[in-house]
Amino acid sequence: MANYKVEDIRNIVLCGHGGAGKTTLADTILNATGLVKRPASVDEGTSICDFDEEEKAHKYTIESSVIHFDHAGKRFNVIDTPGYPDFIGQTIGALWGVDNAAIVINAQAGIEVNTRRVFAEAKKAGLGRMIILNKMDGDNIDLPKLLEMIKDVFGAECVPLNVPLGIGAAFKGVASTLNPPADTADAVIDPKSIHENLIETIVTADEAVMEKYLEGTMPSDAELSSLMIKAVYEGTLIPIFCVSTKTKTGLTELLDGLAMCAIPPTMIERKAQNAAGEEVTLSPDPAGPLCAQVFKTRVDPFVQKLSFIRVYSGTLKAGVQLSASTARRGIKIAQIFEMQANETNPVEDAIPGDIVAVAKLEELETCAVIGDLQMDRFPFPTPMVGLAAAPKSRGDEAKLSGALAKVTQEDPTFLCERNEQTKQLVITGMSELHLQVIRERLKRRDKVELDTKEPKIAYRETIQAKSEGMYRHKKQSGGAGQFGEVHIRMYPFPEGTDPEAFASNKEMFPSMKAFHYEPSNNFLWIDAIVGGVIPSNFFPAIEKGFKDRMEKGVIAGCKVQDVAVELFHGKYHDVDSNEHAFKTAGSMAFKTVFLQAKPGLLEPIVKLEVTVPMANVGDINSDLPNRRGRPMSMESAGGGMQTIVAEVPLAEVLTYNRTLASMTGGQGSYGIEFLRYDVVPGNIQQQIIASAELAEEEE
């Protein structure tokens, strides 16, 4: 059993923008608490938390990493996360596995794009939030201006719990604003000037204490300590700490502050669903029913698959048969590990609040719930940047499949699927950098190299007019021949049209006998044969001919959709007619009539949501017409950000991430969601058809 209680656990994620010093802070804490004897350095490739080979090569965090330490009677589980938005999936998973978020800000750089993003995500996850101003030993820091900006962007709840004594090279310590020292001569900001605001912010967490305070009675230290955690929990206080991880100045005070302010697992109310679908509140009781969730998966070359788990209720034990939401049968955990970055330490069990890992359980996936309850999946963002990928060596195709399966397990923001229309394997991630790192990992870990290029757009073909025609397939080469004749009418069949109502229109189809509707491509075919001119046993072959041609396309090699076909006449031969003949006749009749029915191309239209600083709204709106975009709405996203919603052809936003980064200096984000297919303008249509014809000739 653990030698600490649930109420003594403090789970914190370190998050923020890249270069803020999160990993260095985690490494420094391990060194300061005596768990690691040697100093660690990200730049020198000796970081404890950045142990992955790609992290060492790039000198920044790519994977979240779990460490633990004890301080001031508290058990800390801390998760270091990537700072670049390209790897936001790792941060999202970590946020939903903890109770507190410490947003680390580079005091020299101020609030950056991912600072805003993770702050909003931490609020969405219902976490207690704290801000750590790092690199206080740096040059050109305007602390009053930075604090004012933090309040403007994140709210008046952001109040310093300490202020620096000196700044830049003169930074030599911090002074408490909760208990200001008598001598504050070296303080950059007088802590006494913040003290009253801090106390008022804290006491608002309890009406009775606040009333006494307003009447002149100062709360006791015990009351302040208790109310501070409550205020952080309720979001009415977001404490700010000053530190330099490089010199370790302010580090002890930071750890003391985290022990004093961070929320324990006993305070956050977690919800789950029972077998009946009813909502239940989880109790962080070691004796309660087990409920734990996987928030991260890592494929380790030594211990194979590692599943990182947060326990919410009950006690997780090894050697016990357990149920899991992603396993068909029960699972049995062989060993439970306490993690120190990439080091594993076996433990007997895990209580509520514990963050542990288990190995070699293929059935467990990220977001899987262990126990008999269900919990919601984490809100991972949808990846937007896709590349068509193929192994450089044809002999690596089988190996590539397994390698990509590993990446898909590890990274919820990576997708891999084969587009049946374009015949391309498309890998999709958060950015080009994200996909580049994945390619590097595949090369190192799995010995598979990839060639990538911009993916093809899955255009569709359709018609805009009614047409009628026939095709006779006749072949005689000695012996039994082939004969089949098919007469059809073709109609535009817009998406949303009721197939039964359409086929039952007696004015259009007076001889309709039956109809068949295929929703996948919105295709309706109608049997209107009179007098048995084609035996009904050949109808499936004719329909197969239609469908094969629709799959292959007619004008540009794209799938056909939104078409209705009426089979109204034909001929057959007692000897030479067979299924193959009528399948061919059906396919060629479809092609012939399609070409007469004003054929055209459809393209996927997506909803584009772009969130940018107010200063960039004009740039975004000016750029949309160049992408054939149609603005739909605009609303405030908070923190000086605006969200613009528009409808845009997918073909126009394949590389939008580059444009957006250029226009906003990396401060913008976007998402796309498929809406519908729409007609491609004529001039663009001709270019697409010409490219398809050229590609066919080259093949």
Language-model-derived ranges and their functions:
Residues 1-699:
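Structural and coupling elements of P-loop NTPases
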